[in-house]
Amino acid sequence: MAPVKRRVFKTNNEMAVELAKYTADLSSKFCKERGVFTVVLSGGDLIAWLWKLLEAPYIDSIEWSKWHIFWVDERVCAWDHADSNYKLAYDGFLSKVPVPAENIYAIDNGLGAEGNAELAAERYEECLKQKVNQNIIRTYKSSGFPQFDLQLLGMGPDGHMASLFPGHAQINEKVKWVTSITDSPKPPSKRITLTLPVINCASYNVMAVCDKEQADSVAAALNHTKDLPAGRLTADVEVVWFLDQAAASKLPHGWCSIL
């Protein structure tokens, strides 16, 4: 199991500063080592916390042309729909950085508009396998699952991550790379998501949480409570939890220091 680090910040601004530095440092590392940097985004508040990457020194120093962008989960809708994680990321981040359009891998727009969750999941898995064959995505040494360089994740108050929800069968999927959901307890009901083995094969996983509403689930997940999807999070190299004081308020004393 990869080491788990916990970093608690006094303000969201301080967290955004450190998240930008962490991401930029890994970008530099992987661009030098591999010539590409594979990044997996999530929805929710995560995109808003990437704003420091849009400023100096990062906007001009990051090798954006070597980034390849994927999603840990997506709502089954058209790209321009208000529920779309792609739209959220594009409007708030991707439209402001020079990542080549051909390096951005969103859900199939037509299948999203049709609401075909099962086929959309199959197509996205096919896309990932194509990128593995093109040596853009590596595969994990023992399992053959895709291995992304960095995943930027968030967690819901119920402890869900991606579109893996407590009590859902999808959390136990061990073969598929991407699976579909048609009964999400959080609207919209139709989604696709990377499976837990794929999420846990990433080299680096960041979990960013800023809300007192999530404090109980943060404490439970960091205690590796297995009925919470976020409690099963690991990685190949390391997992880092970026938390504000409210989200960390239920952690045992001494588990982490405030930065």
Swiss-Prot record:
Its main location: cytoplasm. It is an enzyme of class 3 (hydrolase). The keyword Cytoplasm applies. GO terms for biological process: carbohydrate metabolic process; pentose-phosphate shunt. Disruption phenotype: No visible phenotype under normal growth conditions. GO terms for cellular component: cytosol; plant-type vacuole. InterPro entries: 6-phosphogluconolactonase_DevB, Glc/Gal-6P_isomerase, NagB/RpiA_transferase-like, PGLS. The keyword Ribosomal protein does not apply. Its EC number is 3.1.1.31. It catalyses: 6-phospho-D-glucono-1,5-lactone + H2O = 6-phospho-D-gluconate + H(+). Disulfide bonds: none annotated. Keywords: Cytoplasm, Hydrolase. Pathway: Carbohydrate degradation; pentose phosphate pathway; D-ribulose 5-phosphate from D-glucose 6-phosphate (oxidative stage): step 2/3. One of its GO terms (molecular function) is 6-phosphogluconolactonase activity. It is found in: Cytoplasm, Cytosol. Catalyzes the hydrolysis of 6-phosphogluconolactone to 6-phosphogluconate. Belongs to the glucosamine/galactosamine-6-phosphate isomerase family. 6-phosphogluconolactonase subfamily. PANTHER family: 6-PHOSPHOGLUCONOLACTONASE, 6-PHOSPHOGLUCONOLACTONASE 2-RELATED. This is Probable 6-phosphogluconolactonase 2. The lineage of its organism: Eukaryota, Viridiplantae, Streptophyta, Embryophyta, Tracheophyta.
